[in-house]
Each structure stands twice: as C-alpha cells, then as structure tokens.
C-alpha cells in the first residue's frame, strides 16, 4: 500500500505529528518496533505544562481522564547550599505518559492515521535515487513519498542517511542525560509534595507522583546510569530531603546536545528526540518537539500537494522557522548553562542570592551581568574562576544565538553556515566537560 508519509516511531512526537498530517489530508502510517502494550513503558509519570494543551491544539487532560493524576502550579528552585528559594508560577499537569500517548493515538486514528506495532525499520527504500519509503526488518516494503524519523534517541533513520544536509551522529553517553527516578513514600504523613522543587546545581529535584503521600526524587547526569546514581547520592547528601521509603525506580535517557543543523533533506524529516529537541534547563522534550512539528505539518502538506515530491528546497522552511526561533534561544541557553554549573556550591549560592540566571517571577532581570559578578568577586562571594567561566559561556551563548538567528533561507548557503556553527559549538563545549568526579 502507498502512503504520503511513513513515520518511524509512535511516541509523543510521531503520534502528534501524524495527527497534524492527517488533518492536512495526508495518508499517514506510523510504525513502532514495540508492541502497543509495551510502548513508552520506560517512564510512567511526566509533568506537562498546561499552557501546552492550548498552544498545540490538544484537548486538556482533566480529572476523570485515565492519564490524569493531578495539577500543580508552582515550581520552586534553590541554590546548591539549599538557600534563596525562587518561585515560578507554571501550571503543570501530572500525567501517566503511556496513557497520554494512548489518548493522542486515539485522536490520530479517529482522524485517519494508521498505526502498526511490532514493526521495525531496517533501511530506507529508494526509487530513481530518491527516498521512497522504508523496508522493515521483516522484509516488507512500505512505499511513501516522505519518511519521518521519530524513533527517539536511537534515530535509526537519520543515522542511516549519507547526505551532506543530514548529520548521522550517534547520541552517545556524553550527549544525553541518564535520568534516575526514585518513586518514594514519605515517612511523615504531615509532609506532602504538592509542587516541584529543583536544585539545578545537582540537576536534582523532588516532585509530585501519583500515589498519596508519595513523591518522585530525580537526577539527570551525563555518561552513564552508574554516574547518575553517584550524582543522586551526592544530591541527597547535600540537600535535606524528606525521609522516605523507596517504592521503586525508573531509568531513562533524554538527549542533551545540540540538534542537527538541518532537519530535512529530499523526502525526509527528523523530529523529537531523534532530532535532540529538548529544553536545556530541564531536558523536557515534548513541547520542544511539538514547536517544530506544528508549522512543519503545513509545510510538508504543501510540499506533497498535487502528487509532488518533498524536496529539500520545499521543506527548508522547517529548518529556518525552528532554528531562528526556539533553536536560537536554546543554543544560547545551552552554551550559557555549561558555565553556570561549572562552579562551586558557594558560587552557585551567590547567583541565587542575587537573582542572576536563577530568579523568581517577581525579581527583575539582571541588567549588567559583568558588573554584578565583579561585585561578588570584590566581596569575596564569587570566585574569579567562576566569573571567567560564566562570562565566557555567556559570550559563547550569545554568539551562537546570533548565528542561529541568521540561519540561511537558501539551502545553497547552508554549508558555510554549518561550518561556522561547528566552530562555535566546539568553542562552547559540552555539559559533559563539567564532570569532574566520574
């Protein structure tokens, strides 16, 4: 059977994008190697901002819906020394991820999308030298004018491509966060975790879960799950968390690196975790992927209309829209955060005390970063090493942001832009560079 689009991967990015495409009148097949019963079972609970429902046209999850647990509306932050509470008001829904995906899939199917589980991608299918579908591990040929990689961190389709406009890098141990979650029962019945509190210095947090009197204690770390467990011990030794009994643990990975410089080439688009689309401050991926997907659906539909083939040129606007918007903002933030965590707990405490980088909603923005940091150095509250690290990282982040805002309109100008972007990212380094105790 022929399709307009085949999507490899049926989690949040692939399922959401499928629904957008069928609403544009396209014939869409979504495949996933997992069974429907085991899909996305690596994590149970997620925290999803309620503003995202309206932003992305998704029916809100409410009490009585099987995926819904509860809402909360405050996210707190504290320094490495557990001081200077920051308060940010964000409406958040606590959801069961597998059931949330199930509801997204139900909507997509009702709108005309097809799903097949237990079906794995083996290689791309070509006609006249152009992508024309996929071949499964079972040897089945699925014809389609366009292929979308939503396969997650493995990025099985993107990594199989050999194309000057598509990077085939692997998201390795230095390029992702290994997330360790402890589901716990609090010993004191008078202590309730009803909102989220994070300690960014330790990449640690405590947040609500689905059982009464319970909480989730989590950390994220580069390199390995073993190192994440070491970071968890360091976090719990430094921060006085409520006493608890461990119920069970979950472990998963999220990309933590720059996305590909181009998401498209002839007959192809990469989205979601396969494109390393996550929020630098906390690793959240669903809204970041959907920011890319929302305009991309109309661009893909236009490229495929009247039986047309989706060339790189027709799809290029997907690149430009994302990279000059969220891509530019996140490039700057990702580079700056490298400097923000590469310091001592005392340095981090100074940032919190003065609302530098980490601030409450009602605190003013720091107008002159260098002046504020120099005052800290003179007062003996902020180290010269941290000053150099943070100012350098901020400059590198600003350079990256400005470069992304100049993303080329024409694919012919892409190689020169990408060459400079490589150079800027090599200067900025990686969050894994800050690891000193692995």
PLM features per residue range, with description:
Residues 1-13:
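Beta1/beta-strand and adjacent pyrophosphate-binding region of the FAD-binding site
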Residues 42-45, 94, 203-205, 275-287:
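Glycine-rich phosphate/pyrophosphate-binding beta-alpha loops
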Residues 86-107, 156, 222-230:
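Short beta-strand to alpha-helix junction loop
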Residues 121-123, 141, 225-305, 310-325:
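FAD/FMN-dependent oxidoreductases across multiple families
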Residues 301-438:
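C-terminal helical "tail/cap" subdomain of flavin- and related membrane-associated enzymes
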Residues 33-75:
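N-terminal FAD cofactor-binding segment of flavoenzymes
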Residues 10, 109-242, 276:
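Predominantly flavin-linked oxidoreductase catalytic cores and closely associated redox partners
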Residues 6-8, 22-42:
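Glycine-rich FAD pyrophosphate-binding loop
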């Amino acid at each position: 059977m022929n399709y307009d689009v085949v999507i490899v991967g049926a989690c949040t990015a692939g399922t959401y994008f499928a629904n957008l495409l069928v609403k544009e009148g396209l014939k869409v097949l979504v495949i996933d190697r997992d069974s429907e019963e085991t899909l996305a079972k690596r994590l149970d609970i997620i925290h999803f901002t309620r503003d995202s429902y309206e932003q992305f046209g998704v029916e809100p999850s409410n009490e009585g819906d099987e995926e819904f647990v509860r809402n909360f509306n405050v996210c707190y932050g504290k320094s490495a020394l557990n001081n200077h509470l920051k308060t940010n008001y964000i409406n958040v829904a606590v959801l069961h991820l597998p059931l949330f995906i199930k509801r997204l899939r139900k909507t997509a199917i009702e709108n005309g999308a097809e799903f097949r589980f237990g079906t794995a991608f083996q290689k791309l299918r070509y006609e006249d030298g152009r992508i024309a579908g996929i071949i499964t591990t079972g040897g089945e040929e699925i014809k389609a004018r366009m292929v979308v990689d939503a396969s997650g961190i493995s990025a099985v389709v993107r990594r199989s491509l050999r194309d000057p406009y598509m990077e085939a890098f692997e998201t390795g141990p230095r390029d992702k966060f290994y997330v360790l979650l402890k589901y716990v029962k609090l010993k004191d019945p008078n202590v309730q975790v009803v909102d989220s509190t994070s300690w960014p210095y330790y990449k640690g947090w405590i947040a609500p879960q689905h059982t009464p009197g319970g909480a989730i204690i989590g950390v994220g770390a580069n390199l390995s799950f073993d190192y994440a467990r070491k970071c968890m011990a360091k976090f719990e030794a430094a921060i006085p968390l409520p006493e608890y009994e461990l119920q069970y643990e979950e472990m998963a990975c999220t990309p933590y690196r720059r996305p590909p410089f181009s998401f498209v080439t002839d007959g192809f688009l990469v989205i979601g975790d396969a494109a390393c689309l996550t929020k630098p401050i906390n690793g959240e991926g669903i809204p970041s992927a959907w920011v890319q997907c929302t305009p991309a659906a109309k661009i893909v539909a236009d490229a495929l209309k009247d039986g047309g083939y989706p060339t790189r040129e027709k799809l290029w606007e997907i690149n430009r829209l994302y990279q000059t918007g969220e891509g530019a903002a996140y490039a700057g933030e990702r580079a700056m955060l490298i400097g923000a965590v590469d310091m001592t707990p005392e340095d981090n405490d100074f940032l919190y005390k003065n609302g530098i980088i980490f601030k409450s909603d009602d605190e003013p923005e720091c107008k002159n970063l260098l002046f504020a940091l120099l005052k800290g150095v003179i007062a003996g509250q902020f180290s010269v090493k941290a000053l150099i690290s943070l100012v350098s990282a901020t400059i590198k982040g600003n350079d990256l942001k400005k470069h992304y805002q100049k993303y080329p309109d024409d694919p012919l100008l892409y190689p020169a832009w990408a060459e400079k972007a490589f150079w800027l990212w090599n200067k900025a380094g990686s969050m894994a560079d800050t690891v000193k105790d692995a």
